Amino acid sequence: ERSPLLSFSNTDMAFAGDVLVAGSYHGFNTYRLQDDGVPALLGSVVCPGGQGDVSIVGDLLIMSVEQTRGRLDCGLQGISDDVSTDRFRGIRIFDISDLARPVQVGAVQTCRGSHTHSVVSGPGADGKIIVYNSGTSSVRDEEELEGCIGESPGDDRTALFRIDVIEIPVDDPGKARIVDSPAVFADPESGVLGALWRGGDHGDETQETSQTDQCHD
């Protein structure tokens, strides 16, 4: 049986000095850039779930996970249940101080997973890294993760129209957490969450597009 087309596709690269990490839908590879510029493979981590976008901050690697097959234990068997305590969608954090043997040291569950993320600050004097997270997948069942509401718009608590602000303590990444989930598409005057394009077309023979309820990148 053939694997899906994108199962092993590379999705992103991150650099730090002579270190290169290449993320994919199936995990990531670590490399050391040699004097001639050619990368030498040091390690491979199998951890399916896409999206595979990666960032390096010191000895920590931050990785985006979006697909519903992702597991907390990085297992290959995936998850078929609609609701499961084993599912992981969000931000994984790895200690890459030993590039040949990265170790997962933190994981932050989010309602829509993580299609991409941006490291916006840190670590500062408080020893914390701040990450903006954007999920573009479906909103998971609230039975699986409390507070995940997919009403559009309908409910001001909806997980749509938002990003996640994630705080990562460098000395204890296992305590990484979401500190805010602002509605970035809200109208500041009316408070309407879906203040941008609400879906539809622009008249006869024009393209029909979906409601703007997410940040892709």
Ranges and model annotations:
Residues E1-D217:
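Feature marking well-ordered beta-strand scaffolds used for ligand recognition
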